[in-house]
């Protein structure tokens, strides 16, 4: 895929032929020279119960030495590639990725350096559909992770069942108006809480959100 180009996979059957859009998840990723982007994609696919129901919209800000060749021809992928020097920031990059949305029922907005839990796709859909209201949205600041000597993902906390869910808090409002969003490991809960914040490194909701509240 040349710099400045857009690719949609053409080999094989398109996802809509094997999976109804009413069950699909559109995974939107903005990546800026992130060496973990291929890992993030592989993790999403390998840990999903239904990888055939995933589609990806990626704004890939890269140099000529970076490659996503093994994904370019996959019909689940829609990729816009830009020279990293031409980047206009993360808001612009997320907007570019979301412009590749094509009517999938669900939308996951995720960082390009993310690790996925087994069965994440069915789990997120069940959590979302169990919430009241016409337009529920799940969001948090995703926990950091590292790798052990064998290359396995190591998380600082295990998740809902073992440790509870760390709360997203705002400890500081900076002079320029920025909110300093942090995760509180001391305050953990066993169920979802309402929050005044959205953290764009993890948002899961219905796909209509892209059209109702587009990134700019």
Question: Language-model features: where?
Answer:
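Catalytic cores of eukaryotic secretory-pathway lumenal/extracellular enzymes that build
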Residues: 9-216
